[in-house]
């Protein structure tokens, strides 16, 4: 999604009204219920969220010049920096060490990288197809990517071949380096 | 409640991912200067424990010795590549030059055009804005004859611009970059000033 992304892709910037800001926050909480207790710490009431509309109908939400979450269609997707602050709240899967290199260069995640000894998938029933997951790596504390499941986690386990997770956002991609000024 | 994650000042990743960034050497230096605790945790006392460390790494990794070795090799190669690229870029930066040109418009009016800045990762638009407010004049970015971006400042501010760009480059650690000043109005200049010779600079040439 962010393979190519630069300032030229920005169409408009606008400040978000505080009422809409409130709905945004409640939407985030409804998507990730565990965020509820820390949401006011993550996004203080007084902070000013800015909406940046970009190419391909991507919308970024920033606070103080830092991208906190973004939206392509309906669902709000947190950015990695936002995830790092409170990683417990999101559905997480883990890849093995061998896969890190490829993930960091923006590849989709293949099933074997998730099912091998170093990888970790949740027990059944797991996560649905098309849901967003945080991708962690073996022996690492922080998430390195955010992806969208191309098949459900149970399917990944049984099929164990081909693309399992579509890459949305990873460490070092243009969104990660994105800087408003 | 919230976690504070340190990000590497060199590669911007969380430090545990520095090994994959291809800039490991500089990352290590940065981390050892900025966060000794984390450095010790990640890289240990490498000098006397390198062997133990390697064994440790293998033990804690699940992908097997052969693959780990391959990975290590790949990472080394990536690092070498990255270093080469950086060196090349630096050489390119050092060998390129900034051209500051003063051109005459009508009678006693001048513009100053600066080109060749894009190599140095300077945001032209922003710099133009700075100049505009610094000199209280009009300033914009436009394409020149060679289809390259240049900053055009209205008004005779050649010397000030030169000084400012010198300090700007110095800040970036690029002190030895050449600045070429083309001034079509000076008498002493050799007549090789191509482009502007046909402008109406008769005033000064008398």
Swiss-Prot record, chain B:
Key word Glycoprotein present: no
GO CC field: cytoplasm; ribonucleoprotein complex; ribosome
Keywords from the UniProt entry: Cytoplasm, Ribonucleoprotein, Ribosomal protein
Compartments it resides in: Cytoplasm
Pfam families: DENR_N (PF21023), SUI1 (PF01253)
Any single biological process term in GO: nuclear-transcribed mRNA catabolic process, nonsense-mediated decay
PROSITE patterns attached to this UniProt entry: SUI1
Comp. bias regions, Low complexity: 196-206
Predominant place of localization: cytoplasm
Recorded GO MF terms: mRNA binding; translation initiation factor activity
Source organism superkingdom: Eukaryota
The SUI1 domain, residue ranges: 98-169
Region (Disordered): 184-206
CDD domains attached to this UniProt entry: DENR_C (cd11607)
Family statement: Belongs to the DENR family.
Domain notes: The SUI1 domain may be involved in RNA binding.
Subunit structure: Interacts with the 40S ribosomal subunit.
Protein name: Translation machinery-associated protein 22
Source organism of the structure: Vanderwaltozyma polyspora (strain ATCC 22028 / DSM 70294 / BCRC 21397 / CBS 2163 / NBRC 10782 / NRRL Y-8283 / UCD 57-17)
Gene responsible for this protein: TMA22
